[in-house]
């Protein structure tokens, strides 16, 4: 086991940072040093923000979004289209759609996708409340905004079967050529999806 090069408090900071997605031990050490160097302008404010987040952030019991209120800001927004429900895997997907400005509907966060490999089964996801929400008379369309992975596709099929008894239109995001993309750089699966999802011009 490598010998610690700093005091236990700094080593603990490094170990906690290394648990973050995308940060390994080396990156965590660099991040810790940067935080320590900028103690007044970065470390202190970050620690304060994290304390507030730990105390005030809650999961919306309606959609699964994270916010400082329950129901969340999106669920309380009267300007949102109540007839459309956008199903996403995780909060990060919800945030990405919100940044695009293309969605003015309500969301439902599943909290993951079905995965035989990882042992994720339907009861591990936020599916029961989705079926309840879709059964409401105001909902007329469900948009499946799930990733185009094997697990994402499996989950999309499962969700579709789970809400088949509801009188709603089920759509999913188009897959294919990204804006600004060149065909020569795309993989065969993406090109096949683009051909199948082609639209009139």
Swiss-Prot record:
SMART domains: TOPRIM (SM00493). The gene is recR. SUPFAM superfamilies: Recombination protein RecR. Keywords: DNA damage, DNA recombination, DNA repair, Metal-binding, Zinc, Zinc-finger. Residues 83-178 form the Toprim domain. Belongs to the RecR family. This is Recombination protein RecR. It comes from the Bacteria. A zinc finger (C4-type) spans 60-75. May play a role in DNA repair. It seems to be involved in an RecBC-independent recombinational process of DNA repair. It may act with RecF and RecO. The keyword Nucleotide-binding does not apply. GO terms for molecular function: DNA binding; zinc ion binding. It comes from Methylobacterium radiotolerans (strain ATCC 27329 / DSM 1819 / JCM 2831 / NBRC 15690 / NCIMB 10815 / 0-1). PANTHER family: RECOMBINATION PROTEIN RECR. One of its GO terms (biological process) is DNA repair.
């Amino acid at each position: 086991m490598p010998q610690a090069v700093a005091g236990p408090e700094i080593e603990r900071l490094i170990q906690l940072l290394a648990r973050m997605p995308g940060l390994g031990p080396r990156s965590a050490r660099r991040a810790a040093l940067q935080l320590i160097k900028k103690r007044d302008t970065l470390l202190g404010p970050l620690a304060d923000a994290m304390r507030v987040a730990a105390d005030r952030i809650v999961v919306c019991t309606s959609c699964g979004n994270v916010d400082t209120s329950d129901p969340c800001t999106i669920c309380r927004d009267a300007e949102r289209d109540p007839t459309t429900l956008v199903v996403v895997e995780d909060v990060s997907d919800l945030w990405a759609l919100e940044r695009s400005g293309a969605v003015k509907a309500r969301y439902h966060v599943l909290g993951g996708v079905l995965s035989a490999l990882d042992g994720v089964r339907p009861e591990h996801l936020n599916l029961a409340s989705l079926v309840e929400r879709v059964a409401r008379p105001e909902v007329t369309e469900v948009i499946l905004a799930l990733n185009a992975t094997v697990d994402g596709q499996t989950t999309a099929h499962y969700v579709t079967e789970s809400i088949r008894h509801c009188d709603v239109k089920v759509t999913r995001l188009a897959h294919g050529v990204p804006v600004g993309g060149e065909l020569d750089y795309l993989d065969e699966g993406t090109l096949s999806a683009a051909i199948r999802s082609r639209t009139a011009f």
